[in-house]
Amino acid sequence: MRTTLTLAALATAAVMAAPSAFAQQRFITIGTGGVTGVYYAAGGAICRLMNKDRAKHGIRCSVESTGGSVFNINTIKAGELDFGVTQSDWQYHATNGSKVFEKDGKHTDLRAVFS
């Protein structure tokens, strides 16, 4: 449930951040988890909702199956994903540079759209 709400807020934020007149379509990708998991299903639902009205807001959303939370954080940090679903404990570790993120240090630019 928390993940679904997080993805819904993500989609809302992406739509509201877009300008009203679009010169060209913008593409965003949501990193999720395995194709049989809840993260993937929720990400797919968010993208379907966004793509339904893409002519209005100019954003085309795609969902990507990934290795999950840590992969999504690292891939966002590398600039290869726009958004990603992650568990709050891994987000905490990423922003504080602890656990598996200790080597690379704090990820100070990581933001939560909702939790």
Q: Which residue stretches match the model-derived regions?
A:
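Sec/Tat signal peptide C-region and signal peptidase I cleavage site
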Residues: M16-A23
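Bacterial N-terminal signal peptides that target proteins for export
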Residues: M1-A9
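Absolute N-terminal positional cue centered near the fourth residue
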Residues: T3-T4, P19, S98
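Cleavable N-terminal signal peptides
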Residues: A9-A11, A21
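Short, glycine-/small- and polar/acidic-enriched structural segments
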Residues: Q24-S115
